Amino acid sequence: MLVNVKFFRKIFLVFILLSVNLSANEKRQITKQLNSLNSIEFTFDQLINGKTEKGSCLLEFPGKLKCNYFDDKKKELVINNKRLAITQKRYNKTYYYPISKSPFLNILYKDKLLEIVQSGELELTDQIIKLIYLDNNAITVFFDRKTLDLKGWKIIDQYNNNINFSLNIIAKNDIFKEGTFTIPKIN
């Protein structure tokens, strides 16, 4: 009986060590992939409190994002470092927001995204790598298990909105035209 207990303890210990090693390997591979990225172009589906929006974005590290929404307002979002502008082209109106406390900044800055990868709790499925990071705000980041591409994130923003953002990368490391991420002037 004692032999069986020792045998199962050894098997359990080997299983735990292999799991930790696999997790470290996944994180190392994602880190390598992120370090090679300077920019991505992607399409997205965004779900905020039950409302779905779709569009396409250009993301350039660090801190630059431009998204065009496929909606009737012809909404355009531009982030350049810590400034955010949302323009509704149909109505020719632009709204400006501070985002300095937004958990969304964790995605726009590669060093913060790498911190999530290194410190986040890893969960694996057949298709997705899920990293859960608890800091001031909870953020969950998703990566494709095969390609290690960023697939999306889930956050609760500073206004307590549940935001689920899924993306499909179209291109990597493109160079965008100068002025692409210019914040529109105040009207």
Where are these regions (language model features)?
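Sec-dependent signal peptide recognition
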Residues: 6-14
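Hydrophobic h-region of N-terminal signal peptides that target proteins for export
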Residues: 15-24
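Cleaved targeting-peptide boundary
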Residues: 24-32
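A short, Trp-centered hydrophobic/proline-enriched beta-strand micro-motif
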Residues: 32-52
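Short hydrophobic/aromatic-rich beta-strand segments that constitute the beta-sheet cores
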Residues: 42-44, 65-69, 84-87, 131, ...
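Solvent-exposed strand-loop boundary residues in beta-sheet-rich modules
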Residues: 48-50, 90-92, 159
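An acidic-aromatic
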Residues: 57-106, 163
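Gly/Pro-enriched, hydrophobic low-complexity segments
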Residues: 115-187
